[in-house]
């Protein structure tokens, strides 16, 4: 729902789900094994307590997934950045100049652009924020604009699906096969790096319109 299948591994969502499921499945049976005795006086209470513990673990796990869900897919000058809910502070969210970008997505990530400002001071502020671990431009909604307004510049950095200095033969085959699986000819597709704080993947875009066609779990 929040994570496209191709981005599950890149966003580490698969590990989180396995951890939550593993803990919940192990904790219940293990505790039951420890406390279970057929004629134990307080067995029902103990089993109910174990059930409650499992529910608490599950609830915390779901909250963690919710709080770390992807909320914005941001086109910065030369790539895409996937931004998670816990990476944008309420203060920065409130600074968004476009009203619909003041709310974190409840469903799939919202596609936006984030061009670098022309002001040298603002550029310096962004750089300082990035190097001090307080977030780069992709975590600053006040710079968000409609994706369509950034497409022309973004496509200048998009690359063809041919092998070359930027793409190994193996990865070229993976991307070309992915393009075909999405129903497109490789020659009509370009690719861009999709980065996040958790890993990397590749985003396929239409070579002319810049429309996003899909994501590929591949090393850019």
PLM feature spans:
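Membrane-embedded alpha-helical segments of integral membrane proteins
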Residues: 1-35
